Amino acid sequence: MNMLIAQLPETYSIFAPVIDILPVIPILFFLLAFVWQASVGFR
């Protein structure tokens, strides 16, 4: 991933932290859904 970012123009270097966070978002949604179902009681 870092090689890909290094090849991009300098204007995209601002979005590098966002690209690093992107893979974590589905995991956060899964955890949020799990906690929500646990609070509801797995109905």
Swiss-Prot record:
Main localization of the protein described in the UniProt heading: plastid
This protein's record includes keyword Membrane: yes
Disulfide bonds: none
Database matches in Pfam families: PsbK
Propeptide residue interval(s): 1-6
Organism domain of life: Eukaryota
Alphabetically ordered keywords of this record: Chloroplast, Membrane, Photosynthesis, Photosystem II, Plastid, Reaction center, Thylakoid, Transmembrane, Transmembrane helix
GO cellular component term, pick one: chloroplast thylakoid membrane
Residues annotated as transmembrane: 14-34
Membrane topology according to the record: Single-pass membrane protein
Subcellular location: Plastid, Chloroplast thylakoid membrane
Gene Ontology biological process: photosynthesis
Function, in words: One of the components of the core complex of photosystem II (PSII). PSII is a light-driven water:plastoquinone oxidoreductase that uses light energy to abstract electrons from H(2)O, generating O(2) and a proton gradient subsequently used for ATP formation. It consists of a core antenna complex that captures photons, and an electron transfer chain that converts photonic excitation into a charge separation.
Subunit annotation: PSII is composed of 1 copy each of membrane proteins PsbA, PsbB, PsbC, PsbD, PsbE, PsbF, PsbH, PsbI, PsbJ, PsbK, PsbL, PsbM, PsbT, PsbX, PsbY, PsbZ, Psb30/Ycf12, at least 3 peripheral proteins of the oxygen-evolving complex and a large number of cofactors. It forms dimeric complexes.
Family of this protein: Belongs to the PsbK family.
Protein name from the UniProt record: Photosystem II reaction center protein K
Underlying gene: psbK
